[in-house]
């Protein structure tokens, strides 16, 4: 396995590289990993800015303290990633059609993101932040949302009896997302 530490990668198309690698404290700017097989890759304390990882294979991929900013992350199976020390944060990213099924990811930031049709079934998102995030058709089923911040989140549908929402924060203007399951008409 190739090892990279404290390196900056800019404007690189990684889809043309086929070597298994570990990246420690590296930054990636405007790089392409789209549709790439990242099975077994390790990303430790790495930053991704304006990168495309859409439809990449993430089987046993390690993301430890990874930060994604302005990235395109469509259709990713984060549920297939290595569980050990998994920790990610997202700022202004598109994560549509991705899956976090059964993923343990307390204290995760989803700031200014699009999470359309994302699967959070049975995930532990305790104390996570969904600031200014669009959650149209996102699936919350038996999800731990305790202490999460939804005050500026939009278009979510969370069934209070099927999810843990104790001490979660909601704005009075977006409470309708908690009541849709009951068939109420809110004006």
What residues fall within each predicted segment?
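Tandem repeat scaffolds
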Residues: 1-187
């Amino acid at each position: 396995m190739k090892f990279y530490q404290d390196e900056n990668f800019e404007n690189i198309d990684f889809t043309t590289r086929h070597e298994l690698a570990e990246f420690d404290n590296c930054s990636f700017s405007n790089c392409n990993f789209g549709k790439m097989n990242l099975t077994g890759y390790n990303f430790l304390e790495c930053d991704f800015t304006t990168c495309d990882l859409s439809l990449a294979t993430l089987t046993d991929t390690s993301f430890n303290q990874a930060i994604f900013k302005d990235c395109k992350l469509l259709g990713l199976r984060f549920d297939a990633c290595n569980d050990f020390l998994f920790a990610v944060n997202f700022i202004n990213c598109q994560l549509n059609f991705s899956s976090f099924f059964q993923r343990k990811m307390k204290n995760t930031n989803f700031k200014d993101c699009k999470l359309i049709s994302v699967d959070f079934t049975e995930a532990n998102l305790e104390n996570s932040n969904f600031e200014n995030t669009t959650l149209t058709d996102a699936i919350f089923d038996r999800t731990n949302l305790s202490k999460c911040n939804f005050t500026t989140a939009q278009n979510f549908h969370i069934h209070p009896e099927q999810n843990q929402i104790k001490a979660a924060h909601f704005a009075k203007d977006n409470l309708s997302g908690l009541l849709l399951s009951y068939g109420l008409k809110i004006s």
